Amino acid sequence: MDIDMSATRQQMLETAEHLNQQMTDGIPFTWETLEQALTSVTEQDDKGIHGWICYFAAFYQLTTGNQEGCLHYLDESVRCLLGTDQEHHVARVYNMIGIVAHMQNNLSLAMEQYDKALDYTEKYDDKMVHSIVLSNMSDAYYLIGAYERAVQCHAECIREFEQADDNSTYSRINFRKMLAEYGCCLLHLHMDDEAEKEVGGQRS
């Protein structure tokens, strides 16, 4: 029985890891695939893995413009992930909650969620997600005109991205976005030479 249970859990993990790889490679999800995954790995089967799959369901809902559906799955994801061996994924969930709040122009709530995400990236030493969260925080600072804070966040997240050494399509897209936004912040601070050095140097 123990062997069978272990094999079953391994299959559940493989289901979630396959979705994660698909997201990393920039391959769009279909709702049918996600629905099948949610059905095959229920909360009763494994709470943590189910919570991780809920994150992918939330991402799909966000890409289709369904913010309400996205928040529903994000809430489920947080509830299921916390306190399990999959808890390290919760940083990505809080980050996405922050993104939705950001899109709704609720920047105080966005910052609150980004701060929660950073707490978990630090707890689990997840440099890649940490850099993405910092990039999102810098966007919020940029919107309210706090350009110096935005520059600080961008500089830190670029350093962390380089240390993480993740060359996936998803990460490269995020990195280019970081560089472009970093350059805009520097220009607002009239640091034109620094902007050309940072963005132009990375482009070459």
Where are these regions (language model features)?
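N-terminal leader/linker segments that initiate helical-solenoid repeat arrays
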Residues: 1-32, 44, 48
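Residue signature of alpha-solenoid helical repeat architecture, marking inter-repeat boundaries
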Residues: 6-10, 48, 88, 128, ...
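Residue register of alpha-helical TPR repeats
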Residues: 13, 52, 92, 132, ...
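Helix-turn-helix repeat elements of alpha-solenoid scaffolds
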Residues: 23-36, 65-76, 106-116, 147-159, ...
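Amphipathic alpha-helical segments of tetratricopeptide repeats
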Residues: 35-42, 76-85, 116-126, 155-166, ...
